[in-house]
Amino acid sequence: MVGFTNLILLLQPEKKTLIMKAIWTILLLIVSNVFMTFAWYGHLKLQEMKISSSWPLIAVILFSWAVAFFEYCAQVPANRIGFIDNGGPFNLMQLKVIQEVISLTVFTLVAMVMFKGQSLQWNHIAAFFCLIMAVFFVFLK
């Protein structure tokens, strides 16, 4: 069986470059969204753990901004690498829909691990299906 890496090596150089740019874009968006989720919701876990309960709101905001800095350190390169006008494989709409699917997937995984009381309901699964269909439709020509 031919491995994924070997399959990429068999492709034409320009296709290989596009595939690698797509992979890097998606990996960087995953990293970005992990930081984004912690920036947006990590302070709630810190409050639950009694670490930040006494912090003033401005300290919580500054903490979240500090975490979000690392989100942008991954998100900006992801969009630059992946954008078609920069030689990437994705147009602007495709980048946005991919980012939203990654964002909600990462959020769901983090929420289920960090906040044990959260559960996945049928309507959440239906919403994820709609997102997958959004990805399908945005890639149609």
Model-derived features: where do they sit?
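Short, Lys/Arg-enriched N-terminal segments with co-localized hydrophobic residues
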Residues: F4-I19
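Polytopic alpha-helical membrane proteins, predominantly small-molecule transporters/carriers
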Residues: M20-K141
